[in-house]
Amino acid sequence: MAKKNTTHKPLTPAVFYILLALSTQESHGYEIMKRVESDSQGKVKMGPGTLYGSIGRMIKAGLIGESDKKIDPTMDDERRIYYKITGLGKKALAAELERYSEILMVAQQKRIFPNTFAYDI
């Protein structure tokens, strides 16, 4: 019997940061963009094209989905779509964090530390 492949492919920076932003709460697009910038300490600025293109691909891949939660229209724009991370998305994020942890361990063993960088995606 063939062993089931449970390994997740490495994530793009955009997908990683979107999953990270959704890991603690459901959010709409603009809020995700702001959380990406905050989570990266201002080093990653995600534009709407990258965000919504990535969201579409992530929904198709089953990493995120639209939230069933209805927002109070008096508190928020009812046209906003909120997104949530799925079980598969949580597993993919955990696998990516494990990869990063392994890379960091190797870099620490080699006494290699990255320079500060900033980029747009």
Residue ranges and their predicted role:
Residues M1-H8:
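Short, Lys/Arg-enriched N-terminal segment that forms or immediately precedes the first helix
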Residues K9-T50:
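N-terminal helix-turn-helix DNA-binding core of bacterial DNA-binding proteins
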Residues A61-D76:
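Beta-hairpin "wing" of winged helix-turn-helix
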